[in-house]
Every structure is written in C-alpha cells, then in structure tokens.
C-alpha cells in the first residue's frame, strides 16, 4: 500500500489501516518467529493440525499487544501499556465486547491473509452467566482469580504460510497520529530486521527420557467424591431432570519450566486442530484442543461436536479394529447423536430457517493418542446477527455441559467444588472483518504462580460406571502431564 492509498482509506473513515510486507521465511518456523518477535507479555502463537494428522497452512504469531480488555464478573477493565484507562460495571459484558471491537474500523485489504488482526484471547466458561438468568451467580470459589474474559487488541501480527514457506507481517497504523504511514513502515522495517537475527537455541528435549514419568498432582475431587458425584448425576438422569451431564475435575501440579517449553512438548505429543500459547503476563494459557466451539467465516456458522473415544492402536490394523469397535458401541453412538441434535439446535438459534445442515456425520478423526467420532454442523448466519451472537448462543459447548444444557449446568454448579474459569470456555479470535474462530478450552493448561492447572471431565449418562468415569478424567490429562515431564527437562 502506498501513501496515497493509505490517505484515501483514512479519508473514508477508517481509524486503523493495515500495512504489510511479505517475505520468504523458509529457514524459520512459527516457534522461532515467535521467539524473535513476540516473546513478551500479551503475545500469542496459534497453530493447527487438520484432522489430527496434517499441519494447517497458516500459523499466527501475535506481537505484544498494547491494549488489553479484561472482565471480572461484571466489571470491565481496559489497560493500555499496562496502565488501566477504563474501569466500570457492565450488565452485559458480551454486548460490550461487540461495542469495544467497533471502536476499531479496519478496512479489508486485498491480498492479505484471512486473519490480519482482531481481538484475541478467551471467553471463560462462566460467560454463560451473562446470558442465562438461572445461572447468573456461581456458588463456587475461584482460587485462580483470572478474568472471565481476556481479549488483547492484536494490532501487529505475523502470519506464517507453512505451505509456501513465507510470511505476511501486518501492523495497524492509526491515521490520526502524525506521520502515521511513515511510522507504520518503519515498524515493518524493524520487524524485518529482527527476523534476520538468529535466536539463542533452546535446550533440546529428550522424548525418551519423558516416557513413563508422571508428576504427582492434587485434584479438586477425591476419587470417592468424584464417583459419588457421578452417582448423583445418574440419580438426576433417572428422575428425568436431564439426559447427560459433563462434570470435570481440576488437577494441579508444581511447574518450574518455561511455559514455551510446555508448548513445544505439547505440539510434539498431541498436535490438534487448535494449538495455542498465550502469555498474559501474570499467567499463561497453553493448550492443544481438538474441538471447535464455533467458527463464523463469511456468514457460515460451524460447530463440530466430538464425542466417542478410543485409544490409538499399535498399527493400522489395530486402528481399524478400534474404529469399528467405537462405531458399533451403542452408548457412544447414542451420546454422539444427542450432541449432533444439540449442535443443530444451537446453530439454528442464529441461522436462517432451513439452512442448518449436518455436512459430516460420525466420521473418525485420529490424533496422536486417541481417535474420536466427529460430526460437522453448519448454518447460514441470519441477517442482522454477528459472530458474537453466535458465540452467545453456543457457549459453552454441549460436550462440556450436557443436555438439556441449562439444567446440566445447574447440576455442574451444584457438584463441582471450584469455578471452571478458562476450562470449557472459548479460546481464539474475533477478526476485524467479522469472522471468528474459537476452540473449546480443553486439554489446556493454566500456569500461574509456579503451578500448572489442567481440567478434564466426561459425559455421564444413565449407564455410566463411576469408577470408569474417574479413570477417564485421569486418562485425558495424560498427554498434558507427559508434556510437562518433557518440558521440565529444561530446568533439570
């Protein structure tokens, strides 16, 4: 973009204008670029492996963000360069997020990647309390004390094209500032110079040395208490209160390693469609989620329910046998069909009448340690609605709550001992162009004050076995704890 085009867009009323360059980066990786450009508070790295087995084309590196929006319960706090500039109470923080995003008027520039910046971060599970009056208050304590919503204004990003081995660097310039175009170009030149610099190699991680190492942890439930909670849910199901509830437990351990080393280990052990590393300054969120919560792209709303799990086999023949076993399991199929119906209902709340479709039904996706039954539900976003309306309708996912959703969440509030926080919420971005891509925050670690917290649960139905449900929560955290053992080598 030349200076005349920049000034023309400013005259059209845009108050943030993207400037960019493209360059070859075939000697770099998304991780090396993150370490060169963004290894500081309020930065992030987003990557993807499609279907559990193929790297997604684009990785996104978010440079440190100056402006951050945090919401605690109903209190909104906005800070710029670490200094709080606004604090006020808000009846509907989700509606305010939409208003806040509208402060940034950014044109769509041809030739740029589909994500060129936006609001990036998370919406916690408890955001449902802004929407559902029956869930307006949470009776449980919140020992971590993190925001219910944390969104960074991402105004400088590097998009890594894994296929072409090149990058787009994009910065937003504010045309109200003096010499805005020249300052934006100078920032791009500075980024290019930093990209040319070598990085200090990090210590290698020995994959074999981490085998079989299981750190001791403390859990929010004892085994007896968790199994009793499962029994209580089964009583509710038999009484007709609900069909399924998804309780969870939090497991916490001491953690001394660098959070980025945990991400390195996790992307090796458990590559998934949604991998993310967030440095929020006083805490980190590091995850490898297999499941989209909701995606909105050019008006198409997508959810992709996952339910039904088997371990991976030792070879292709064993994998196929396990697939057949999974697809012939009546309990797993019944649970999955219920979640397809829940997904259709959620998408239908914001879609044109008759536009909701199940475009994939009960296919198997393989990941590093497990395989899942997966379906795909889409709808056309109704005119006058936005991506935030879709998020409001769908958060939290049925796979993390149950059915009927509101009654299931009431039971979760009754039985779980602590507030869920990030777990079960949405992690991802709201792009300037109106698109959104969010993952369900599962298989995700929250690192704060020298401790790592990971949460896992499972769907309880009428014939669930309490002892097996406890084991399922333990098994689901194994990939994360294996990654912890690998990351901790860096401090040994």
Curated annotation (Swiss-Prot):
What is the activity regulation entry?
Answer: Feedback inhibited by tryptophan.
The reply on keyword Cell membrane is no
Q: Note the InterPro entries from the entry.
A: ADC_synthase (IPR005801), Anth_synth_I-like (IPR019999), Anth_synth_I_N (IPR006805), Anth_synth_I_PabB (IPR005256), Chorismate_C (IPR015890)
Q: Which Pfam families does the record cross-reference, listed alphabetically?
A: Anth_synt_I_N, Chorismate_bind
Mention one GO molecular function: metal ion binding
Q: One GO BP annotation here?
A: L-tryptophan biosynthetic process
Where along this sequence does the record place binding of chorismate? 308-309, 423, 443, 457-459
Residues that coordinate or bind L-tryptophan: 48, 273-275
Q: Which domain of life is it from?
A: Bacteria
The annotated subunit structure for this chain is:
Heterotetramer consisting of two non-identical subunits: a beta subunit (TrpG) and a large alpha subunit (TrpE).
Q: What is this protein called?
A: Anthranilate synthase component 1
């Amino acid at each position: 973009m030349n200076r005349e085009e920049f000034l023309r867009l400013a005259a059209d009323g845009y108050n943030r204008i993207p400037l960019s360059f493209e360059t070859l980066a075939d000697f770099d990786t998304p991780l090396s670029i993150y370490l060169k450009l963004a290894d500081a508070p309020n930065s992030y790295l987003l990557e993807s492996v499609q279907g559990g087995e193929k790297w997604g084309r684009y990785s996104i590196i978010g440079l440190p963000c100056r402006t951050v929006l945090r919401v605690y319960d109903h209190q909104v706090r906005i800070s710029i360069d670490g200094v709080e500039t606004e604090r006020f109470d808000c009846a509907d923080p989700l509606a305010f997020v939409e208003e806040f995003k509208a402060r940034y008027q950014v044109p769509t520039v041809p030739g740029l990647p589909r994500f060129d910046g936006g609001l990036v971060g998370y919406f916690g599970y408890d955001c449902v309390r802004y929407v559902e009056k029956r869930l307006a208050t949470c009776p449980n304590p919140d020992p971590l004390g993190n925001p219910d919503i944390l969104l960074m204004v991402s105004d400088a990003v590097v998009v890594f094209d894994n296929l072409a081995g090149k990058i787009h660097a994009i910065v937003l310039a504010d045309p109200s500032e003096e010499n805005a175009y020249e300052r934006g170009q100078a920032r791009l030149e500075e980024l290019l110079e930093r990209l040319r610099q070598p990085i200090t190699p990090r210590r290698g991680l020995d994959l074999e040395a981490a085998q079989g190492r299981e750190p001791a942890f403390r859990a929010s439930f004892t085994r007896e208490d968790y199994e009793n909670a499962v029994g209580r849910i089964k009583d509710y199901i038999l009484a007709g209160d609900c069909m399924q509830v998804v309780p969870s437990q939090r497991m916490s351990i001491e953690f001394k390693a660098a959070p980025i080393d945990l991400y390195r280990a996790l992307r090796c052990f458990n590559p998934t469609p949604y991998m993310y590393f967030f440095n929020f300054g006083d805490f980190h969120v590091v995850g490898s989620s297999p499941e989209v919560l909701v995606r909105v792209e050019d008006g198409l709303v997508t959810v992709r329910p996952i339910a039904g799990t088997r371990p991976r086999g030792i070879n292709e023949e064993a994998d196929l046998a396990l697939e057949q076993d999974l697809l012939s399991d009546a309990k797993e199929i019944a649970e999955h069909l219920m979640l397809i119906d829940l997904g259709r209902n959620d998408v239908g709340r914001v879609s044109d009448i008759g536009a909701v479709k199940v475009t994939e039904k009960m296919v198997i996706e393989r990941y590093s340690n497990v395989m899942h039954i997966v379906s795909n539900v889409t709808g056309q976003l109704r005119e006058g609605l936005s991506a935030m309306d879709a998020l409001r309708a769908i958060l939290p996912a049925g796979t993390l709550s149950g059915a009927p959703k509101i009654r299931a969440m009431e039971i979760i509030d009754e039985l779980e001992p602590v507030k869920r926080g990030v777990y079960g919420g949405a992690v991802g971005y709201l792009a300037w162009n109106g698109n959104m891509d969010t993952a369900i925050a599962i298989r995700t670690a929250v690192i704060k004050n020298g401790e790592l917290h990971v949460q896992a649960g499972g769907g309880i139905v009428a014939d669930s076995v309490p002892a097996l449900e406890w084991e399922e929560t333990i098994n689901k955290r194994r990939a994360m704890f294996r990654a912890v053992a690998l990351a901790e080598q860096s401090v040994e």
